[in-house]
Amino acid sequence: MEAQLHAKPHAQGEWSTGFCDCFSDCRNCCITLCCPCITFGQVAEIVDRGSKSCCAAGALYMLIDLITSCGRMYACFYSGKMRAQYNIKGDGCTDCLKHFCCNLCALTQQYRELKHRGFDMSLGWAGNAEKQQNQGGVAMGAPAFQGGMTR
């Protein structure tokens, strides 16, 4: 199944999978259905390039959702961030509409997009950066990890 996912080319500026393709990755779909904070945390860690851990991002999502029911709004912010990083067409209104109509579909679409771009979502940012470095930096479609400030 994973080989098929990576083999599908997608148009520049477009999502690699459709909004309603949740069941193309049944495992992630079930995880997201039962506990969306896990999928959100995995996505946020990659999008934030490791500045926030999966656990911290997932816990914050869950806390925001439990206290204010605005977890979807928080996830919306990450859709925009991800679109900007990968030059995917869209706008904030569409992101919000997707998350408010079907948060499950929106989160799984983000997860699949990162997976299609070469990320192993179970490794997190640091694991993927190390994997890329060990493979000579050519296997992943992710931006290279930037170190601290230099002169």
Swiss-Prot record:
**What is its subcellular localisation?**
Cell membrane
Primary location recorded for the protein, binned into one broad class: membrane
Q: What would be an example GO MF term here?
A: mRNA binding
**Keywords, ordered alphabetically:** Cell membrane, Membrane, Transmembrane, Transmembrane helix
| Record note on disruption phenotype | No heavy metal-related phenotype.
Q: Transmembrane helix: present as a keyword of the record? A: yes
Identify the Pfam families for this entry.
Answer: PLAC8
Expression is induced as follows:
Up-regulated in shoots by cadmium.
* Keyword Nucleotidyltransferase set for record: no
Superkingdom per UniProt: Eukaryota
Q: Enumerate the InterPro entries for this protein.
A: PLAC_motif_containing
The signal sequence is none
Kindly give the membrane topology term recorded for this protein: Multi-pass membrane protein
Q: What does the entry state regarding organ or tissue expression?
A: Expressed in aerial part, but not in roots. Detected in the guard and mesophyll cells.
GO CC annotation: extracellular region; plant-type vacuole; plasma membrane
Annotated consequence of substituting C30A: No effect on cadmium resistance. Total loss of cadmium resistance in a heterologous system
Consequence recorded when altering C37A:
No effect on cadmium resistance. Decreased cadmium resistance in a heterologous system. Total loss of cadmium resistance in a heterologous system
Any stretches that span the bilayer, and where are they?
A: 31-47, 54-71
This molecule's function is given as: Involved in glutathione-independent cadmium resistance. Reduces cadmium uptake rather than activating efflux, but is not closely coupled to calcium transporter.
Q: Which family does it belong to?
A: Belongs to the cornifelin family.
Quoted from the entry, the domain comment is:
the N-terminal domain (1-84) is required for cadmium resistance.
Database matches in PANTHER family:
DUF614 FAMILY PROTEIN-RELATED (PTHR15907)
Q: How does it assemble?
A: Homopentamer.
Question: Which NCBIfam families does the protein's record reference?
Answer: A_thal_Cys_rich (TIGR01571)
This chain belongs to the protein called Protein PLANT CADMIUM RESISTANCE 1
Lineage of the source organism?
Eukaryota, Viridiplantae, Streptophyta, Embryophyta, Tracheophyta
